[in-house]
Amino acid sequence: MSQLTELVLLTVFLALFSRAEANPFVYNYEALRIGGLVFTCVLVAGAVTALCWGQCKPKRKHDDDASKI
């Protein structure tokens, strides 16, 4: 519990005494869009693969099955 308290106090201390940058961060929207599209494509391909994983197995014929008498 004391470690959590120390962590919270350190976070508050750093937030209060940190200076704002003169030049704020500027996003590179083109790279962000391309990265998002790649991530989405990989995620969708993984989901489709996971859903179809057991669907494409070949059917086996059980001619020697003794339980079908």
Curated annotation (Swiss-Prot):
Gene Ontology CC terms: membrane; plasma membrane
CDD domains the record matches: FXYD11
Induction: Induced in larvae and adult gills by low salinity and repressed by high salinity.
Cytoplasmic topological domain: 55-69
Disruption phenotype: Morpholino knockdown of the protein results in an increased number of sodium/potassium-transporting ATPase-expressing cells in larval skin.
Species of origin: Danio rerio (Zebrafish)
UniProt entry tagged with the keyword Secreted: no
Coiled-coil regions listed in the entry: none
Swiss-Prot/TrEMBL GO biological process terms: monoatomic ion transport; positive regulation of sodium ion export across plasma membrane
Protein purpose: May modulate the activity of a sodium/potassium-transporting ATPase.
Topological domains annotated Extracellular: 23-33
InterPro entries documented for this protein: Ion-transport_regulator_FXYD (IPR000272)
Keywords on record: Cell membrane, Ion transport, Membrane, Signal, Transmembrane, Transmembrane helix, Transport
Protein name, per record: FXYD domain-containing ion transport regulator 11
Tissue: Detected in adult gill and in larval skin at 2 days post-fertilization (at protein level). In adult gill, strong expression is found in the basal regions of the secondary lamellae.
TM regions (residue ranges): 34-54
UniProt membrane topology term: Single-pass type I membrane protein
Family designation: Belongs to the FXYD family.
Location of the protein in the cell: Cell membrane
A Pfam match: ATP1G1_PLM_MAT8
GO MF, one example: sodium channel regulator activity
Segment forming the signal sequence: 1-22
